[in-house]
Amino acid sequence: MNNNDLFQASRRRFLAQLGGLTVAGMLGPSLLTSRRATAAQAATEAVISKEGILTGSHWGAIRATVKDGRFVAAKPFELDKYPSKMIAGLPDHVHNAARIRYPMVRVDWLRKRHLSDTSQRGDNRFVRVSWDEALDMFYEELERVQKTHGPSALLTASGWQSTGMFHNASGMLAKAIALHGNSVGTGGDYSTGAAQVILPRVVGSMEVYEQQTSWPLVLQNSKTIVLWGSDLLKNQQANWWCPDHDVYEYYAQLKAKVAAGEIEVISIDPVVTSTHEYLGREHVKHIAVNPQTDVPLQLALAHTLYSENLYDKNFLANYCVGFEQFLPYLLGEKDGQPKDAAWAEKLTGIDAETIRGLARQMAANRTQIIAGWCVQRMQHGEQWAWMIVVLAAMLGQIGLPGGGFGFGWHYNGAGTPGRKGVILSGFSGSTSIPPVHDNSDYKGYSSTIPIARFIDAILEPGKVINWNGKSVKLPPLKMCIFAGTNPFHRHQQINRIIEGWRKLETVIAIDNQWTSTCRFADIVLPATTQFERNDLDQYGNHSNRGIIAMKQVVPPQFEARNDFDIFRELCRRFNREEAFTEGLDEMGWLKRIWQEGVQQGKGRGVHLPAFDDFWNNKEYVEFDHPQMFVRHQAFREDPDLEPLGTPSGLIEIYSKTIADMNYDDCQGHPMWFEKIERSHGGPGSQTYPLHLQSVHPDFRLHSQLCESETLRQQYTVAGKEPVFINPQDASARGIRNGDVVRVFNARGQVLAGAVVSDRYAPGVARIHEGAWHDPDKGGEPGALCKYGNPNVLTIDIGTSQLAQATSAHTTLVEIEKCNGTVEQVTAFNGPVEMVAQCEYVPASQVKL
């Protein structure tokens, strides 16, 4: 999956010679009643209370309270019965010291442009410039790079951005740059990089982002639910579109059934997750597997199913291919080592009889396997995802209600019955207008690379790597543009990122917060938050419950501009403004998107009101007729008429396609591969004995809302990001709850606040991803992160030659108590604004 596709998406160079610079200072300081529309199967037009401005977000729909021009409070939307605690931090997203207020340019880049001293990136010294000046420089750099280097030197990237169908940073970035010239594209993503590549080879579809079997059917039919590295309760707080949180009602029903003994839940995880805790420790069977040994456990389960004749031979014969090729490996005929429970016990820390008992229980009745994403974010993560499918196939329940497997249960309200409604379009990143620089000569380099390997491209241009059956020659990147993303949060091994950044000529960041990505950029452009503009959004993701108006809460703050206006002005500089806007402004686009929805609805028998009526009076419409769904049911009922998208049309336990790639780290069937580093007696554990998890956070969405002081007050320890550690590990190191500690390995070091908890198995620690990077020595590689970003510690290697995805969870660390003075966190302030003490020199007089 192309990352840019997934997340779509008067020359006045004024200052060339700066004389003396002085520091100017730090920048900073009621239930819904509904009426049925008259048309058949119409949307419900909700009568909304006017107490607060209605808008949406990744964390849910809210009513915003504004006082004296400031967004001061967020209350849950009336229909959200299970609102996220994170909405309390939304006002801070608009008003905080880390807000980007003005266009800024890094000091030395302003002096020398692409010939600047790149080792100064990260020193946080910037000069404020006008919008015209900033956009002129942006345009001039695009021109220079296209003319000097060509498309192989330019990479753009986006990420989670903000909600809204129109104000889509990824799509706007993609379209604007495509109108100027070609660039390097990216494939894959950081969330599901391994699974989304292997699963289409095995079951013919990506699986990870797709709808799951409806929860009512699971609750009715399942007897055993296996949560394998999946924390439903924590992760459903935030979704891609505005969440309705209806899925939490099914979690409440699950809790009741578990308490009544009607369903047994098994959690395979080295941690007692939030979901585990919610369902009750006394009711959940906990399999605290040693980190990164899930595949040995899976193989041992498969071995038990086979050796005890508990597997479904008919399902394997009629719906699968390749079990016969997999079996010799499972039985040890290839390497002399049967992958039985006794073998797995030594690796997993789970005694052999418990493993055998788990296999028997899964085979005894209807079992739903709920797989998360964190386990595949490790070296060889493809193998775990593949083995989930193999286990489900051996059980023979794929396509039955309450049985089989799923990889997306923790995301986008999966399992909530979807409603028959409209899915709005949005602002597309594609365009049929030819670019100004219509140059498709990548000079022998690849035009698309795996996103998790883009730092490799910067550091090792020309290196040839394998990727999903293709050979990729990494391009010599010179310029990167980021909008709606924070690579210093999502990419691994930050000190390696910093080394790569020094080789780039120009970095441009478009954002609303001074993240580390912005601090390490050359040109920083202030974008509005979603609360400073108008938009539309789906309400509910897989549920498709309705459509919500996203009303502007406050005006754009300081000099922030909408991404649409930023890129419109950029495109004007190369005569593509009309091609970018298509002649429409913000409200014009919203009306077009709405009208396209009206036409779509006619084909589905769904009526939408006129836009003006919706926008001015209704603000929300709700769809009817939730539909029950069973994942893979059509395939099970008729595999000939409903084949999977694999070469055989069946589940491929053995893949000839993968085998023919001849990769030593991902072969024709799932296997156990030792990791480059692994805790509990594995490689590297003598020096760094603790496994570090860096899973999704509980109080933010990735790095979004880390700027919220309101939320940080609820979870930080001594002003630091918490590190969770088992009592035994803490005691052995003289660490107590609340201590500031240093977490370190050969790749880096961070400070964090200790939280001692028995929810974490011995040898396991956790720092949530998304913590802002706060180096004590600016842009110097190896600097101590004063706040606690775990990606300072993670390793930047691909999962395998197949997916080339992130291996964040292949990370070992040591932890020690800090003694003496601890440096204060400065990540949540703005930059040091520099003021020139010289005359500006026209660009025409400067030799660059």
Swiss-Prot record:
UniProt keyword terms in alphabetical order: Metal-binding, Molybdenum, NAD, Oxidoreductase, Periplasm, Signal
User: Could you describe the post-translational modifications of this protein?
Assistant: Predicted to be exported by the Tat system. The position of the signal peptide cleavage has not been experimentally proven.
- Listed GO biological process terms: anaerobic respiration
Pfam families, per the entry: Molybdopterin, Molybdopterin_N, Molydop_binding
Gene Ontology cellular component terms for the protein in this record: outer membrane-bounded periplasmic space
Residue positions annotated to bind Mo-bis(molybdopterin guanine dinucleotide) are 191
Where is it localised? Periplasm
- The first-level EC class reads oxidoreductase
The cofactor note reads: Binds 1 molybdenum-bis(molybdopterin guanine dinucleotide) (Mo-bis-MGD) cofactor per subunit.
What the record says about family reads: Belongs to the prokaryotic molybdopterin-containing oxidoreductase family.
What is the designated name of this protein? Trimethylamine-N-oxide reductase 1
